[in-house]
Amino acid sequence: MSRPSTPLLDKAPTPDRLRALPEQDLPQLAEELRTELIDAVSTTGGHLGAGLGVVELTVALHHVFNTPYDRIIWDVGHQAYPHKILTGRRDRIRTLRQAGGLSGFTKRAESEYDPFGAAHSSTSISAGLGMAVASELSGEKRNVIAVIGDGSMSAGMAYEAMNNAGALDARLIVILNDNDMSIAPPTGAMSAYLARLVSGRTYRSVREAAKQVAQKLPKFLQDKARKSEEYARAFFTGGTLFEELGFYYVGPIDGHNLDHLLPVLKNVRDTQKGPVLIHVVTQKGKGYAPAEAAADKYHGVNKFDVITGKQAKPPANAPSYTKIFGTSLIEEARHDDKIVAVTAAMPTGTGLDLFGEAFPKRVFDVGIAEQHAVTFAAGLASEGYKPFCAIYSTFLQRGYDQVVHDVSIQNLPVRFPIDRAGLVGADGPTHAGSFDTGFLAALPGFVVMAASDEAELRHMVRTAAEYDEGPISFRYPRGDGVGVDLPERGSVLEIGKGRIVREGTKVALLSFGTRLQECLAAAEELGAAGLSTTVADARFAKPLDHDLIRRLAREHEVLVMVEEGAVGGFGSHVLQFLATDGLLDRGFKVRALTLPDIYQDHGKPDAMYAEAGLDRTGIVRTVFAALHRDELGHEALPTPFRA
């Protein structure tokens, strides 16, 4: 299929070439950029809606500012695809989120035009402020621009950074990309005129002169003059909150109208003092009818047909773990009216959208605010409710102090369903669920579980619902289950007890999580090589099943622990117990298979697990090495001595 014609975009592969184009050509360039973006993402999948919404803004920023000397920081990075196309990466844009291809987010190692990596929200203003202060300390006249969406403004970190920027009077430009119309809509020509007026040098010079005069007046008149100016600007433009934080507010302006964007950006570029916030209103999915009509469905997309907008969906072998969690929680909530659910802006991603349909008054979406979500859940638990605080593994990191201080130390029975455990594929290291087992199992009294399949997940939801002795978590991966039979309702598991899945005599494989299927496949291969193999499902990283571990150690020659997590997790806890219990004193062979001690780049999950040695081949290879056998399973002969 031929690619769309883009004559102007072809002439502007980098921002310096873009800046050479006359302004009257920029609307056409924006349309070509939008067409190229749609065509590229239709072949790769990815985050489409946010990028479509900032096409004109991206063109305007690179036309007005001297990138990469001037820094543009994209919060989260979902909206950075147009930026990548314009900054020398167009030839690789159809490798987005593929192994060896472009990242789906901004990445410092990828381009000098990406001054700061992103993927988690609300970090851009803090990073930008650091860069702005560094520029000032170095005596450089560099512009630093942080582009942040209104959704990211629900996180307290954004306001912490703005408060600090205002106190420092730093020369920082923040662009608030309001794509949900959640603050205020632009009101046509008058709004654009006022934005251009108040961002200009003349207005700001007069305003500064008036301040100097006012300082010579009695204090009560100074206060009246200041408030009169604030009220007048707030009446026409809004922005009082940002002004209180020390920012000079401009907007709202139409983020799809280059005639409105360009003069405001130029005015702000030429301002020499203080932090400025430009309020830009955009539309997610702009310019592509299917995305405009269903912005939520086009936030993140699979490959799709450009003409119809229909997304390709791979056939599912079983329900997804996320769906199993959602339906299982609904079943438990039917039996217990104390069960409530909390999500931090991810109801669909965590399966709580299903719960919300069944129990709309018992689900709480707190926005992008994981710290608040955890302590909010702790408050619910303190009053006798049973909160399930469902957060992706990678995002739970953002609320760890609250997990420790507000939940664990007080031993409050908050339930933590941890989605996206292990590797997540195309989203790469920023979204991998590598660390939750380690950082939760380190906490006294915290129960830490991992589901090996979808039936086990259903049991763990029931177990968590019934457990009131303290905090409890259970982790599960992205994607579909393995296709096991599902009970209508889960059973309550005995806390700290695993299970034997396959009996053997020589080798023991102890799995924590969904690598269990690979362990079973490895056991078949090992058995074919004459190595009788036991496979056990640990279920719990804390408390450990000491009886099970002792049995595996005493009855086998080799024990291999397998987990979808970083060093310092389940395997480390097992090794600590083996050492303390004296089970290593007789030369017992133990190996721990974890994710490698690196940040693995994006790719297909199966390939990434193979690279990590966590597939059947890697498990078999580890056992052979422990027993000094070659790749065929034959006992390796000692190397003869040579004089």
UniProtKB/Swiss-Prot annotation:
EC number of this enzyme: 2.2.1.7
Pfam families: DXP_synthase_N, Transket_pyr, Transketolase_C
Listed pathway(s): Metabolic intermediate biosynthesis; 1-deoxy-D-xylulose 5-phosphate biosynthesis; 1-deoxy-D-xylulose 5-phosphate from D-glyceraldehyde 3-phosphate and pyruvate: step 1/1
Sites where the protein binds thiamine diphosphate: H78, A119, H120, S121, G151, S152, N179, Y288, E370
Superkingdom classification of source: Bacteria
PROSITE patterns in alphabetical order: TRANSKETOLASE_1, TRANSKETOLASE_2
Cofactor(s) required, per the database record: Mg(2+); thiamine diphosphate
GO BP annotation list: 1-deoxy-D-xylulose 5-phosphate biosynthetic process; glyceraldehyde-3-phosphate metabolic process; terpenoid biosynthetic process; thiamine biosynthetic process
Record-linked SMART domains: Transket_pyr
Reactions this protein catalyses: D-glyceraldehyde 3-phosphate + pyruvate + H(+) = 1-deoxy-D-xylulose 5-phosphate + CO2
InterPro entries: Dxylulose-5-P_synthase (IPR005477), THDP-binding (IPR029061), Transketo_C/PFOR_II (IPR009014), Transketolase-like_Pyr-bd (IPR005475), Transketolase_BS (IPR020826), Transketolase_C (IPR033248), Transketolase_CS (IPR049557)
This protein's encoding gene: dxs
Free-text function comment from the UniProt entry: Catalyzes the acyloin condensation reaction between C atoms 2 and 3 of pyruvate and glyceraldehyde 3-phosphate to yield 1-deoxy-D-xylulose-5-phosphate (DXP).
Entry keyword set: Isoprene biosynthesis, Magnesium, Metal-binding, Thiamine biosynthesis, Thiamine pyrophosphate, Transferase
Residue numbers binding Mg(2+): D150, N179
SUPFAM superfamilies: Thiamin diphosphate-binding fold (THDP-binding) (SSF52518), TK C-terminal domain-like (SSF52922)
Family membership noted in the UniProt record: Belongs to the transketolase family. DXPS subfamily.
Protein name: 1-deoxy-D-xylulose-5-phosphate synthase
Oligomeric and partner information: Homodimer.
GO molecular function: 1-deoxy-D-xylulose-5-phosphate synthase activity; magnesium ion binding; thiamine pyrophosphate binding
Note accompanying the cofactor annotation: Binds 1 Mg(2+) ion per subunit.
